[in-house]
Amino acid sequence: MTLWINGDWITGQGASRVKRNPVSGEVLWQGNDADAAQVEQACRAARAAFPRWARLSLAERQVVVERFAGLLESNKAELTAIIARETGKPRWEAATEVTAMINKIAISIKAYHVRTGEQRSEMPDGAASLRHRPHGVLAVFGPYNFPGHLPNGHIVPALLAGNTIIFKPSELTPWSGEAVMRLWQQAGLPPGVLNLVQGGRETGQALSALEDLDGLLFTGSANTGYQLHRQLSGQPEKILALEMGGNNPLIIDEVADIDAAVHLTIQSAFVTAGQRCTCARRLLLKSGAQGDAFLASLVAVSQRLTPGNWDDEPQPFIGGLISEQAAQQVVTAWQQLEAMGGRTLLAPRLLQAGTSLLTPGIIEMTGVGGVPDEEVFGPLLRVWRYDTFDEAIRMANNTRFGLFCGLVSPEREKFDQLLLEARAGIVNWNKPLTGAASTAPFGGIGASGNHRPSAWYAADYCAWPMASLESDSLTLPATLNPGLDFSDEVVR
């Protein structure tokens, strides 16, 4: 029984599904998808639970959410192993994900008060007040690269605001989704407040098509995000928050410390085996001898990166990709770039047939036309050389995406110029692209999202504002508008 609907674990009535470790092939999880009727059942449960949950005080809802944080802490080792085994990422990285989940609780509570709390301004004859109300029933679609942390970034602020939720994890990480749901169950969420439906495309389409849905919060690919946007078009009454990845540029201008710059680039491009929406996909490198030396060092260090299993000792920097198919897609993308005229500096290699262990790849595309503006979700870095900083900015902006942009340079003036001209929601200076703060908004423009940033701003799309003018008594104004006469003679 792998679905959690209205406070009960039930068996899915859809297709059967098996999840294996992407490196060892070990069977980790077996279950069945939710069919359309069970998705509707989850929605009815969430709708029925909404009035009571929304009427609780923030303090009462916060108690449950903080209890969940405590359970994350006490079950950290177990959840770390589940995430690592299911995604293929190393144990150390899965542990940082669980830590991020724990930290998200306090940050979300603070963000609720700052972004969507209550305000009151006194007036001579009363007060002006601002409150925020929950939308109602929200669907949350989770991705596979951070199956705990990223859905958590939607679920926690949505629950704090008073919404009820139907959560569909990625079909590639059902075990992690179930493990997190069981902790919410232990935290004491009332039946129907948070419901779990497992499944792939058919389950997702049934969920997003629900008429009685008040909103949908999504993290995933641009293709799926665009499909959801089209599906919900003409329904302005539903809140839609999309985070859809990027084709992110990292500009390496002047480099004082080559080793430090190489380290930053590897952290930006290859951490999580390149499976972060924030990963650098395009390296824009200044022409000249210094750039040549940097590139040679980058290739040499990257060549020594050997992916390993989640529990290997010593721990590897990267593990496997989410699946063998995902790894093969990266290899295919590299082969296509090479066929277009790209010059391979480091060829990505599948280390073992039947696994997702893929070494990083680096390919130079300077002077090659018609390169697809697509996000290759894996450890493949494309390199372009430039002559002037203005040219670098034009190249950085030459994408339909707009999530992340980074600059390595000792010159503050160039960063200031980039801040003015970059078309990206997050712009970093001498910091990895894969570094972002939960105390700041997270999101992009263009094909990277629909102007609903998450993290610190997630509270904004989890509630709507209600403004009020208030007075505890009603009296006739001392001064009336022209044409109004309330004299005793007229009244009688």
UniProtKB/Swiss-Prot annotation:
It catalyses: N-succinyl-L-glutamate 5-semialdehyde + NAD(+) + H2O = N-succinyl-L-glutamate + NADH + 2 H(+). Pathway: Amino-acid degradation; L-arginine degradation via AST pathway; L-glutamate and succinate from L-arginine: step 4/5. Keywords: Arginine metabolism, NAD, Oxidoreductase. GO terms for biological process: arginine catabolic process to glutamate; arginine catabolic process to succinate. Coiled coil: none annotated. It holds the Pfam family Aldedh. Its EC number is 1.2.1.71. GO terms for molecular function: succinylglutamate-semialdehyde dehydrogenase activity. SUPFAM superfamilies: ALDH-like. NAD(+) binds at G220, S221, A222, N223, T224, G225. NCBIfam families: arg_catab_astD, PRK09457.1. Belongs to the aldehyde dehydrogenase family. AstD subfamily. Catalyzes the NAD-dependent reduction of succinylglutamate semialdehyde into succinylglutamate. This is N-succinylglutamate 5-semialdehyde dehydrogenase. The lineage of its organism: Bacteria, Pseudomonadati, Pseudomonadota, Gammaproteobacteria, Enterobacterales. The gene is astD.
